[in-house]
Amino acid sequence: MEESPLSRAPSRGGVNFLNVARTYIPNTKVECHYTLPPGTMPSASDWIGIFKVEAACVRDYHTFVWSSVPESTADGSPIHTSVQFQASYLPKPGAQLYQFRYVNRQGRVCGQSPPFQFREPRPMDELVTLEEADGSSDILLVVPKATVLQNQLDESQQERNDLMQLKLQLEGQVTELRSRVQELERALATARQEHTELMEQYKGISRSHGEITEERDILSRQQGDHVARILELEDDIQTISEKVLTKEVELDRLRDTVKALTREQEKLLGQLKEVQADKEQSEAELQVAQQENHRLNLDLKEAKSWQKEQSAQAQRLKDKVAQMKDTLGQAQQRVAELEPLKEQLRGAQELATSSQQKATLLGEELASAAAARDRTIAELHRSRLEVAEVNGRLAELGLHLKEEKCQWSKERAGLLQSVEAEKDKILKLSAEILRLEKAVQEERTQNHVFKTELAREKDSSLVQLSESKRELTELRSALRVLQKEKEQLQEEKQELLEYMRKLEARLEKVADEKWNEDATTEDEEATAGLSCPAALTDSEDESPEDMRLPPYGLCEHGDPGSSPAGPREASPLVVISQPAPISPHLSGPAEDSSSDSEAEDEKSVLMAAVQSGGEEANLLLPELGNAFYDMASGFTVGPLSETSTGGPATPTWKECPICKERFPAESDKDALEDHMDGHFFFSTQDPFTFE
């Protein structure tokens, strides 16, 4: 650190120290708060020191700490920060004044605090003067500072507890909000996925629409090209038609020219016959005619080779016709020139007749002329053949022109057909474009319908989900109700089992008493029968045993036709009216058996009680009264009463004493028993099980 003089007052816009106390307690850490002005760049090399007020340089510090550099600073705003001085490095208590000074990395003091002291607290410092809030009283209340601080601490602790509870509540709310946010994020992810799928579908539809649009544009361009091609073909067809018409006109002209040439040739033949006298001139004329015929042959050959170039050939033919016309004109001129020669020949013949000498010469000349004439005739015949050949060639040319005309007409018809086919194809392509546009529109409509249905299905799924939750809640409540009912039924079952045990004990007691009474009565009757049988007869109507139904004993399985032994008769069989014991059925195995076996045991107990006598039934089932006994005894001991009375006493129907339901007499006895069991007994098994 460099030594530099210190200024007593901080520079304008320097570091500002906050909350500086006038005194600090020694051996306690001191916290220094300060604010850096806007535009100041804090550095880890800056430091804050505790200086004496009279210190003149930066090296006269008592202790210092490095300044803290904030993580993030906002441009144009002051920076608030703080540092702590440890208690072990602080000055000792005294009257010396100190102050905080901020020194930057260049060793320049950027700010200083007001002066303060380090001293021990005085006794009066521990007391605090309190004034009443309303200010109506002049009394000052002096209390220890510790009490005030303790009260403030308690209030702060209470406030902290309230804030902690509020924090817990807020954390719970934050947790709920986070769960809600997660649910919303999942829903958002689902919606985004659906949106992505819909976007992919839309992109696919857009791509297909773009492809269809491109195909439509291509087809439109092709249609334009085809239309232009059709127009070009129509122009070509029109041009070709004009050319064909021109060729036909030229062909007609050539035919007329050939006919004229033929007539002129015939005239020339006639003229050649007349020019037989002039052998030399005729020979020269024949030579010229041969040359012309040879030239015509060459022209015909050229015309045959130049058939494809019709326009040029026609022009050549026109030129040839003109040349032939010129030649014919020259021939006519020569024929006209032959007339004076004929006259000269006649004069020469006259001179020949007049001169004999000349006759011999003329004879020789005539012989040579005859030979020349023969040659001329042969050449004339040859020229006629050549003319006929030329005529044949001209006919062939006419046929060839007709064939070309037919071919042009066929090509024209083919071109027209191709044009019609192109038109049909263009119409089909237009219809296909319209159909594709309609399909695209339908796909858009269907996509919109799908989106609407998707939204509707989403809403319906949400409604179904809420309905499912509500139904689940109802099912849970119903399950709880059923469980409560099941518990009640179990309690009722336990009560009925307890009641059946009590009935069993009472039944055993009544059965033992009845058996003892029957044994005593039989002994007394046996003794009285031996002593005074007449007295027994007189008291027969008053005997309570005769009022009871015949006891159910072993004699029931005997002959049904035989009547039971009366009290006066000594029966060889011992009748035991004791019912079947119930205790073996309800002891031990009854706890392991099912509810159905328990119901069967209880039913057998009741039926045994009914068959044994009305008193036992009334003791066992006092709630049912005599109706159950009468009905039960009516269908259980009916055969015994029949045998005792000797007449049929079977009822036509059986009636349940509880619900008065009737059963046919011929129905199975177990049906009525099962029906009655349904009123008193139930199965302990659950009808169904909730998962």
Curated annotation (Swiss-Prot):
The modification Phosphoserine is found at residue 4. Residues 1-30 are annotated as: p300 KIX-binding. Residues 145-205, 232-339, 417-514 form a coiled coil. Residues 45-125 are annotated as: Interaction with GATA1. Zn(2+) binds at residues 656, 659, 675, 679. Residues 501-691 are annotated as: C-terminal AD (CTNNB1 binding site). GO terms for cellular component: cytoplasm; nucleus. Keywords: Activator, Coiled coil, Cytoplasm, Metal-binding, Nucleus, Phosphoprotein, Transcription, Transcription regulation, Wnt signaling pathway, Zinc, Zinc-finger. Its main location: cytoplasm. CDD domains: Zn-C2H2_CALCOCO1 (cd21967). It is found in: Cytoplasm; Nucleus. One of its GO terms (biological process) is Wnt signaling pathway. PROSITE patterns: ZF_UBZ1. InterPro entries: CALCOCO1-like, CALCOCO1/2_Zn_UBZ1, SKICH, UBA_autophagy_assoc_protein. The C-terminal activation region (AD) is used for downstream signaling. Seems to be essential for coactivator function with nuclear receptors and with the aryl hydrocarbon receptor. The N-terminal activation region (AD) is necessary and sufficient for synergistic activation of LEF1-mediated transcription by CTNNB1. Contains a EP3000 binding region which is important for synergistic cooperation. Part of a calphoglin complex consisting of CALCOCO1, PPA1 and PGM. Interacts with the bHLH-PAS domains of GRIP1, AHR and ARNT. Interacts with CTNNB1 via both its N- and C-terminal regions. Interacts with EP300. Interacts with CCAR1 (via N-terminus) and GATA1. Belongs to the CALCOCO family. Functions as a coactivator for aryl hydrocarbon and nuclear receptors (NR). Recruited to promoters through its contact with the N-terminal basic helix-loop-helix-Per-Arnt-Sim (PAS) domain of transcription factors or coactivators, such as NCOA2. During ER-activation acts synergistically in combination with other NCOA2-binding proteins, such as EP300, CREBBP and CARM1. Involved in the transcriptional activation of target genes in the Wnt/CTNNB1 pathway. Functions as a secondary coactivator in LEF1-mediated transcriptional activation via its interaction with CTNNB1. Seems to enhance inorganic pyrophosphatase thus activating phosphogluomutase (PMG). Probably functions as a component of the calphoglin complex, which is involved in linking cellular metabolism (phosphate and glucose metabolism) with other core functions including protein synthesis and degradation, calcium signaling and cell growth. This is Calcium-binding and coiled-coil domain-containing protein 1. The lineage of its organism: Eukaryota, Metazoa, Chordata, Craniata, Vertebrata.
